[in-house]
Every structure is written in structure tokens, then in C-alpha cells.
């Protein structure tokens, strides 16, 4: 999620004028028509593709009656009439830029009391105008199947991002904001929300070097723009290994007890002396699981986890640009610069948190890896060891899959396999189960809606309206969940349009979707897109189903956690609505949802066999989960290693020796120091995509995981369907978006006042209370 540095605001909205009400009534009539033609169950629209295509007007064999009943209007992406083509996207960007400029001119020249009172509100409207282009383009360039749309999105994103960075260093805007906040006659009439947002904006201006000389501000703009471009290039290439294949001598593989069936599928080089194992597809991974030759496994693993030299250079350039920007802002490191305003306020507290967690986990991790060490020692004819350091020294990352498989061959389990389990979890079952869960704990449900022609970027996209039992429609989720060529491989939650209050002076709603508050005022509906890459399987002629592994169920719950934050975090001002909050707080609602996804009571309610309708047995789930959770601490430690790598790439040593800093050397040295599953062979750091989006804040996943664990045990362990505790979580945390201090939110949810102020003691408390 891209966060706009500046521009956040809001104000008390009043009931619209009569002429404006008429326009809104026309809008809601259209929305009502969509609602009337909503299909039946959620399960059916995700599990029966022919039904979906039929009711959505995509089936050429539709009956005349069906075509009449489901007649569709024509529109653009997300019901924005501009977005029917790449040129339309460019036009929308230009129109938005013009609107932003007009609003800017008004703000700079309105010195009346009214102008001062609405200044923060107008900053937020300005931000919304820019973000509705920037966030939209962020989504399109990651997901849209049309290359022309992707190119247009990149162009528009660059243009708007540069304009935004210019505004972030605009001295006149900052000075007016300071005068508003420092004038008691004005500030006393502002809402608490406006004052909070105004202070955040002022901090963000200062973070952009607003008080520095013009040359420095111009340099800040250039660096920010370059970081954005280099970062996008970096993220676009993280899926690609360094080479398409790796050569393995035939004699090494032929004598490694590998399946002859597998070997026959491999090509050889011209001389016939080497197998050419592709670094894509299943073959290399199958060899990692079955090849007894460690040197072969090592070579394969290294190739699978490496990237090109060009990608390493992109990462190095990104890291150095960030260090230069931080230095320009008089900070010792990019981590210090980035952590301002976060829950963890400085790099030392972050590193202490990670180290505490590592120290609490390393013995458990070594104990989990002990079975691999024993099997490997036996193969190498070495004496067995129980010493932690010796275990960790012996077990390497290319051993994990091979010896895990060998262990289960020697110790066969009666647990069901992943395929058996997945037959109970069709995509439709899981989405329906999520809706039922949200209905019980939050009083909201997911309701399918037919899309207009042109509203989505693929015929496989489903629209879900989010319906509150008290307020009606409160948001929209576009679900792009099925596998598609060229689509991002990483699951993601994209904010397309934030929620915010709509003000009396606003009359044009052609490019947004609008909701109504219980008091009769109006708000911009939050619009988000959930993107996954689930693979349907053909089960009969012309019928396919998408069966989810439990890990994929967890992924979907995680992304829906973000979605609920976006829907329920409805503030007056868009820049603090939903997931527009501190980076080390934003993962908390989504990680909490992972606990629900692992709960047997939830899973037995969702899991229904696709053929018989039989409910999955709790014992079946428990046996399977026990067989797959045996390396939990190892996974936690691996996440901690990545968090420490992120800190290492953004600490003070970069700027002090910038010409000689080597990202791969730094990565491998850290791996050796941290001991667990040491990788001192690959340049995997060049494939760590989160280094761009979560630069200096990747610790957020672990940090929020420890907090989510405490919240789960406090609120939902006894009853995951508790409406009382669901309301408590919604009231004290979700509804605030980024307005309320995150530490205060957590303290209120846990009824733990000592956490309210945050700081080192609170960080230490969270780290020590980690439960794996």
C-alpha cells in the first residue's frame, strides 16, 4: 500500500443541499438496481463458473429472458466512466491533476476565516484526488492483463507521484497549515480529528525537508521519484531466478536414487554430460526432496534462490538512494528516518525486539531441526549431537525438504494428505464461511453483486458488496482470485478508493461510489481489490472447482483481515481511513484473521466436501495440522532473520561506506551470524520483494503477530464467534483506522493501560510474550 506523505484532513459534514440530494438519489437508484440483480449464494458464484457467466451476461447462449433480466450498463473500471481504455486512464489522471490544481489555487488564496477553518479538510480532499489516481495506478500496473493499460498506469503514476512530492515540499502550504494550528481562534473550532490530522500533516511536511533550502527540497523530490522508479523495477523482477536452468553432471544425479521417471523428463546439454534442470516448474523442487547427494541439492537450492546480477544492482541502488535521502534529511540512517511516527519509534527498539524474539526462539528452533541433524549425521557417519550450535551448523537450507521427506518415510503418519483436506475447502465454501464469521462477530455480511460491462478487468472478477446490518452498504470488494497469466504471484490487498466524508460543496460523483450514513450524510465508499492466484481444477466436462490448501485458506483470511480494516475504519478523512495507519500496526487485523483460519471450530463449520456435502471431521483436521506444524519456531526465526536483514540494509553503516557497501556480502555475513539454516551461497536478498514496500519496517509482520496472538487469546480463544468481543475489537481498534494512537487501541482491547504510551518497555513486553 502506497502511503501519501502529505494531505490528510476532514470536517463535520452537513446534510447536502436539495439539488445535491437529487443527484445522490439518482446515484442510489443505480446502486439499488445492482442490488436487485444480485445472485444467490456466495458459494455458487465462486464455485459454479457457468452460473456466474450466465447471470453476469458473459454466456453467448443466454436466453432472451436472462439477457433482459440481467441487462447491464456500460461503464469503466470500478464504475469510473473514464476507465474504459488506457487513454481514458490518462484523461482521468489529467482531469484529476486539473482538479487538484484548482483546489490548490483556492486554498492558497482564501484568507477568510472560512478558508482557514476548511483548510485541513481541503488538504484531505487534495490528497484524495491524488490518491484515487496513484492507488488506482498501483493496482492496474500490478494486475491488469492489458499491457497498454499497464503502461498508461506507469506513466500516470510517475506524473502524479512527482506532483505529490512537489506538494510535500511546498513551503506556502506548510506555512498556512502552521498558522491554522497555531491560531487559537481557528484551532479551537476544529474537530479533534482535524487537529490530529493537521499535526500528522505538519510532521510529514517536516519529514520532507520543508525548512531546508530550495536546492535540498528539489533534491528530495528527485530522490523520492528515483526511489519509486527503481523500487518498482526491483519488485517487477523478484520472481525471476538468475538463470533458466542449472547444469548438474549426469553421473551425480544418476547415482542419487532419484526417480528414473523424473530424470527422463530432464533435458541434457549438447555433449550429454549434464542434465539441464529448469529453475521453474516442479522438477527442481522434486529433486530437492528426493536427491541424496548434498552437493546436488546445494547447487539446485542456490540456483532456485538466486537472482541476476542486474537485480542485485537494482537492490543496491535502492538501498543507497534511501541512505542518501536519509542523510539529506539529517538522519543517521534510513531506518531512523522511516521509523518516525511508527509504533516502534527508533531502530534500537526494533533491533532489540527482533533479538529478544530470536533469543527466546533459537533453542526451540534447534530442537525442531534436531531430527534433520540426526538423519544427516547418520548419513555422514558422524556422531549424534544435542548441542544447539552443532545442530545448527550441520543443518543447511537445502537439507530441509530432503530430510523432512525421509523422516516421514521412516515414520509414516496416518494423517490425511493436503489434497484430501482441500476437497472440503472450495473457494466458495471459504468465502461463504468468511461472510458468516463477519456476520456473527461484526454484524456485517458479504453480498454478491452483478457488475456492469467494463467494471472489471477480467471476466473472472467477482464483486462483493459489504453490508452492515445497521448501516446498509459500507464498502465494495472486487475479488480477483483465480489464476491468470501475467498476474502478480503474490496475494495482495489493494486500496483503490478510501472512505471519507463527502462535503456539501461536492456535486460530481461520476467517478466514485457513494454510501449514506445513518444521519443522512454521505461518504465515499471504500473500494478495495483482493488479488490471489488460486488454481481451478477440472472435475468434470466443462466444470472446474478451486480447492484451497489450508495455507491458502489462511492467505485468504489474512487478506480479508485487511479488507475488514478498510471497510470498518471509516473516518471523516481519507488519509487516516482503513489501512492508512502506521506500517507496524497495519498487519495486526490481517494476522489476527490467521488465528481464525487455524481454529478447528471455524474450519469444521466451513469445510464441506464438494461431492457429498459432508462436514469435515475435527479429528481429521487435527491430525493433518499436527503433521504440518512441526517447524513453527523455525518459521518464526526465519521471519526474524528477514526482519534483521531489512534493518541491516537500512542502518547507519550504509552512508558511512556507501561506495563499498555490498548487499550480497552483507546478506551472507548476517546469515552466518544468525546461524539458523545459513545461506552463504545465494544472493536471495535480490528476491526479497518486501524490501521495497516495507523498507526498514519488515519487522511489522513479527511485531503484529505477537500482538495478534495476545488479542486472540484474550478475546476469541474461548469463542471465535463471540459478538461481544468482535464488537470490542471493532469499537476499540478497527473503527479508528489511523486516527487513534495504535498503542492506545491495543491497550484498550487488552485492557492493559501500561501499553498506552508505547516505548521500549511496551516493545519488550510484546517481544517477551511471543507465542509461537
From Swiss-Prot:
Reported impact of residue 562 to R: Abolishes proteolytic activity
GO MF entry, a single one: metal ion binding
Annotated cofactor note: Binds 1 zinc ion.
Presence of keyword Isomerase: no
GO cellular component entries: mitochondrial matrix; mitochondrion
Localization annotation: Mitochondrion matrix
Annotated catalytic residues: 559
Additional information: Present with 2690 molecules/cell in log phase SD medium.
Name of the protein described by the UniProt record: Mitochondrial intermediate peptidase
GO annotation (BP), single: peptide metabolic process
Annotated source species: Saccharomyces cerevisiae (strain ATCC 204508 / S288c) (Baker's yeast)
PANTHER family, per database record: MITOCHONDRIAL INTERMEDIATE PEPTIDASE, PROTEASE M3 THIMET OLIGOPEPTIDASE-RELATED
EC identifiers of the protein: 3.4.24.59
Effect of residue 581 to S/V: Affects protein stability, but has no effect on peptidase activity
Regulation: Stimulated by Fe(2+).
Gene3D superfamilies (alphabetical): Collagenase (Catalytic Domain) (3.40.390.10), Neurolysin, domain 3 (1.10.1370.10)
Recorded superkingdom: Eukaryota
Function: Cleaves proteins, imported into the mitochondrion, to their mature size. While most mitochondrial precursor proteins are processed to the mature form in one step by mitochondrial processing peptidase (MPP), the sequential cleavage by MIP of an octapeptide after initial processing by MPP is a required step for a subgroup of nuclear-encoded precursor proteins destined for the matrix or the inner membrane.
Transit peptide limits: 1-37
Summary of the knockout phenotype: Simultaneous disruption of the mitochondrial presequence protease CYM1 results in synthetic lethality in respiratory conditions.
Consequence of changing residue 558 to R: Abolishes proteolytic activity
Cofactor: Zn(2+)
Family statement: Belongs to the peptidase M3 family.
Effect on the protein of changing residue 578 to L: Temperature sensitive; abolishes proteolytic activity for RIP1, but not for COX4
Listed Pfam families: Peptidase_M3
Catalytic activity field: Release of an N-terminal octapeptide as second stage of processing of some proteins imported into the mitochondrion
Amino acid at each position: 500500500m502506497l502511503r501519501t506523505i502529505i494531505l490528510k484532513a476532514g470536517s463535520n459534514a452537513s446534510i447536502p443541499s436539495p439539488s445535491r440530494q437529487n443527484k445522490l438519489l439518482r446515484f442510489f437508484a443505480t446502486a439499488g438496481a445492482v442490488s436487485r440483480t444480485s445472485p444467490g449464494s456466495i458459494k455458487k458464484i465462486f464455485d459454479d463458473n457457468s452460473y456466474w457467466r450466465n447471470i453476469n451476461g458473459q454466456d453467448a447462449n443466454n436466453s432472451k429472458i436472462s439477457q433482459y433480466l440481467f441487462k447491464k450498463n456500460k461503464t469503466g473500471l470500478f464504475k469510473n466512466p473514464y476507465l474504459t481504455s488506457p487513454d481514458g486512464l490518462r484523461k482521468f489522471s489529467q482531469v484529476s491533476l486539473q482538479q487538484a490544481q484548482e483546489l490548490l489555487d483556492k486554498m492558497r488564496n482564501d484568507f477568510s476565516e472560512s478558508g482557514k477553518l476548511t483548510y485541513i479538510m481541503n488538504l484531505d480532499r487534495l490528497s484524495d484526488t491524488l490518491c484515487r489516481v496513484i492507488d488506482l495506478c498501483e493496482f492496474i500496473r500490478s494486475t491488469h492483463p492489458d499491457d497498454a493499460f499497464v503502461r498508461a498506469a506507469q506513466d500516470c503514476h510517475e506524473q502524479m507521484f512527482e506532483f505529490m512530492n512537489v506538494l510535500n515540499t511546498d513551503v506556502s502550504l506548510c506555512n498556512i497549515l502552521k498558522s491554522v494550528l497555531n491560531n487559537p481562534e481557528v484551532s479551537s473550532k476544529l474537530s479533534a480529528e482535524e487537529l490530529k490530522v493537521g499535526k500528522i500533516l505538519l510532521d510529514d511536511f517536516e519529514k520532507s525537508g520543508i525548512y531546508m533550502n530550495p536546492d535540498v527540497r528539489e533534491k528530495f523530490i528527485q530522490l523520492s521519484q528515483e526511489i519509486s522508479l527503481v523500487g518498482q523495477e526491483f519488485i517487477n523482477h523478484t520472481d525471476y531466478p538468475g538463470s533458466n536452468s542449472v547444469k548438474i553432471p549426469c553421473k551425480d544425479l544418476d547415482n542419487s536414487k532419484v526417480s528414473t521417471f523424473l530424470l527422463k523428463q530432464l533435458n541434457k546439454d549438447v555433449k550429454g554430460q549434464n542434465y539441464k534442470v529448469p529453475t521453474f516448474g516442479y522438477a527442481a523442487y522434486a529433486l530437492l526432496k528426493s536427491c541424496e547427494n548434498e552437493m546436488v541439492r546445494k547447487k539446485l537450492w542456490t540456483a532456485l534462490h538466486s537472482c541476476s546480477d542486474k537485480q542485485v544492482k537494482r537492490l543496491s541502488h535502492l538501498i543507497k538512494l534511501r541512505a542518501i535521502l536519509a542523510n539529506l534529511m539529517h538522519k543517521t540512517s534510513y531506518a531512523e528516518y522511516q521509523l518516525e511516527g511508527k509504533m516502534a519509534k527508533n531502530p534500537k527498539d526494533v533491533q532489540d525486539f527482533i533479538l529478544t524474539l530470536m533469543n527466546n526462539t533459537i533453542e526451540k528452533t534447534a530442537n525442531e531441526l534436531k531430527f534433520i541433524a540426526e538423519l544427516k549425521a547418520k548419513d555422514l557417519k558422524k556422531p549424534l549431537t544435542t548441542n544447539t550450535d552443532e545442530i545448527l551448523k550441520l543443518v543447511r537450507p537445502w537439507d530441509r525438504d530432503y530430510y523432512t521427506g525421509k523422516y516421514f518415510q521412516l515414520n509414516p503418519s496416518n494423517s490425511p494428505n493436503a489434497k484430501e483436506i482441500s476437497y472440503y475447502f472450495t473457494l466458495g465454501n471459504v468465502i461463504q464461511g468468511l461472510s458468516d464469521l463477519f456476520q456473527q462477530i461484526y454484524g456485517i455480511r458479504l453480498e454478491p453483486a452483478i457488475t456492469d460491462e467494463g467494471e472489471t478487468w477480467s471476466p473472472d472478477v467477482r464483486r462483493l458488496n459489504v453490508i452492515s446490518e445497521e448501516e446498509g452498504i459500507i464498502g465494495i470488494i472486487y475479488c480477483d482470485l483465480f489464476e491468470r497469466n501475467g498476474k502478480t504471484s503474490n496475494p495482495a490487498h489493494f486500496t483503490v478508493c478510501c472512505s471519507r466524508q463527502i462535503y456539501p460543496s461536492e456535486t460530481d460523483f461520476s467517478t466514485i461510489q457513494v454510501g449514506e450514513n445513518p444521519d443522512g450524510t454521505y461518504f465515499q465508499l471504500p473500494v478495495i481489490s483482493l488479488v490471489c492466484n488460486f488454481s481451478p481444477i477440472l472435475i468434470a466436462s466443462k466444470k472446474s472447482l478451486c480447492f484451497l490448501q489450508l495455507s491458502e485458506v489462511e492467505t485468504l483470511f489474512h487478506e480479508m483481515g485487511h479488507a475488514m480494516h478498510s471497510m470498518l475504519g471509516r473516518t471523516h478523512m481519507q488519509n487516516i481511513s482503513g489501512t492508512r495507519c502506521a506500517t507496524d500496526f497495519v498487519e495486526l487485523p490481517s494476522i489476527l484473521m490467521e488465528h481464525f483460519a487455524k481454529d478447528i471450530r471455524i474450519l469444521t463449520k466451513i469445510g464441506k466436501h464438494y461431492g457429498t456435502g459432508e462436514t469435515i471431521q475435527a479429528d481429521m483436521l487435527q491430525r493433518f495440522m499436527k503433521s504440518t506444524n512441526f517447524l513453527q519456531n523455525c518459521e518464526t526465526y526465519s521471519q526474524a532473520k528477514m526482519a534483521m536483514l531489512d534493518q541491516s540494509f537500512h542502518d547507519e553503516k550504509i552512508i558511512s561506506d556507501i561506495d563499498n557497501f555490498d548487499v550480497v556480502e552483507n546478506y551472507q555475513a548476517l546469515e552466518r551470524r544468525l546461524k539458523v539454516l545459513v545461506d552463504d551461497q545465494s544472493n536471495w536478498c535480490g528476491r526479497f520483494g518486501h524490501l521495497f514496500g516495507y523498507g526498514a519496517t519488515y519487522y511489522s509482520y513479527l511485531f503484529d503477530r505477537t500482538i495478534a496472538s495476545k488479542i486472540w487469546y484474550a478475546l476469541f480463544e474461548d469463542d471465535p464467534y463471540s459478538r461481544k468481543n468482535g464488537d470490542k475489537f471493532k469499537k476499540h481498534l478497527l473503527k479508528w483506522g489511523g486516527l487513534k494512537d495504535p498503542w492506545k487501541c491495543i491497550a484498550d482491547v487488552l485492557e492493559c493501560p501500561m501499553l498506552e504510551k508505547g516505548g521500549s518497555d511496551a516493545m519488550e513486553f510484546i517481544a517477551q510474550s511471543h507465542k509461537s
